[in-house]
Every structure is written in structure tokens, then in C-alpha cells.
A protein has these predicted regions:
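N-terminal secretory signal peptides that target proteins for export/translocation
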Residues: 1-11
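Sec-dependent signal peptide recognition
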Residues: 12-19
Length: 201
């Protein structure tokens, strides 16, 4: 009787240990299977220009029409990875062949050129484009070549202070260069902004 009780206790002990090992194994499997894969954050599409104008203080506007040809625009970097999906433009005059360029700031090379038909004055035109991926914190520039533009300044004059954050975009400078050539502008000015060319990000 004693031997059979010992055998029974040994069997029970074996069963308990086996049960515990199986439970631990299943628990570990569940923990692996239950690891949640976090989907990438999707930000709503934004055109950062309006926020740039407000945050820069360049809220006084005058129209320049047929005022000489320039390549001009803004230097920016995204605060997150993302894509440009559209180019926007608005001018005080019609321009069927407005050239808008996205540049790699560091190499001063062209990443994308789009011709926008500004078919009506003082009207925001949006042109969908093949997506252009932008890398977080990398510097880019968007420029247009035009002899018409809105000249935006502070109401009491003065300069703005860069960088200027507008949503997920950080603007770091305004650049310009005279002429019709598609050439990277090298003159900087913090006392005004001329435009409008922008993008949807």
C-alpha cells in the first residue's frame, strides 16, 4: 500500500510538473502571438503655407504684376517622413505655364518640376502630382519662376525669425534670384515673402 501511494504521488507530481510546463509554454506562445504591430502614424494632408504666413507675421499683402522675372521660394524641412502629393499656386494674374520646382537644398539639384496652369487670378490652383517622398529633418526648397506675385510683409515692417513651424513643416529661409533660368536661388531675405507656391504634404 505504501509503495502504491508513493507511485501515485510520484505520478501526480509528474502530472503537475507537466501541466505547469505546458501552461508556461502556452503562455509564452501567446505572448509572442499577441505582440501588437503598431501601424505607422498617418497624418492628415496639409498645405503649410497659410500657417507659415500667419506665424511669420507676413500678413500685409500687395500685388506685383509683370514686375520682372525671378526664381523665388521657401526652404523647408519636414518634421516627419511624408510625401508631397500636390502642388498649389495662387497669383494676382493669369499664368498658364508657371514653373514650380522642388529642390534638394544640400545639393541644389532638382527633385521635381511641375508646370501649373494658373487659369484665374487670385484663385488657389491645386495640381495633383506623382508622390515625392520627403525625409524627416532633411532640407528642401520649393520655388516658382514668375513675374507676378503676392508680396507679403509685416504690417509695421520688420523681419521675421526663422525657423517657422507650420504643422509638420518647418520653414528655415526665403530665397530669390533674378532671371527666368531654373537656377537655385541664393539670395536670402527675412523681411518679406513673395508667392504663392506651396504643396500638399
Amino acid at each position: 500500500m505504501k509503495n502504491s501511494a508513493t507511485i501515485l504521488n510520484t505520478k501526480n507530481l509528474f502530472r503537475i510538473m507537466l501541466f505547469l510546463l505546458l501552461s508556461l509554454s502556452i503562455s509564452n506562445c501567446r505572448s509572442d502571438d499577441d505582440d501588437v504591430i503598431t501601424p505607422p502614424i498617418v497624418y492628415p494632408a496639409e498645405n503649410p503655407l497659410a500657417a507659415y504666413i500667419t506665424n511669420s507675421g507676413f500678413t500685409a499683402t500687395s500685388n506685383f504684376i509683370n514686375s520682372g522675372d525671378y526664381e523665388f521660394g521657401l526652404v523647408f524641412s519636414p518634421n516627419v517622413n511624408g510625401k508631397i502629393t500636390a502642388i498649389t499656386a495662387q497669383l494676382p494674374d493669369i499664368n498658364a505655364t508657371l514653373r514650380v520646382t522642388i529642390w534638394d537644398f544640400d545639393t541644389q539639384t532638382v527633385l521635381k518640376t511641375e508646370v501649373v496652369n494658373v487659369s484665374a487670378a487670385n484663385t488657389l490652383i491645386t495640381k495633383s502630382v506623382a508622390e515625392l517622398a520627403l525625409v524627416k529633418d532633411k532640407k528642401y526648397a520649393i520655388t516658382m519662376n514668375s513675374n507676378d506675385w503676392y508680396n507679403r510683409t509685416k504690417p509695421a515692417a520688420g523681419v521675421t525669425t526663422y525657423p517657422i513651424t507650420a504643422g509638420n513643416i518647418k520653414f528655415t529661409d526665403y530665397l530669390w534670384k533674378s532671371g527666368t533660368a531654373q537656377a537655385f536661388p541664393t539670395n536670402s531675405d527675412a523681411s518679406y515673402y513673395a508667392g504663392d507656391a506651396s504643396f500638399v504634404f
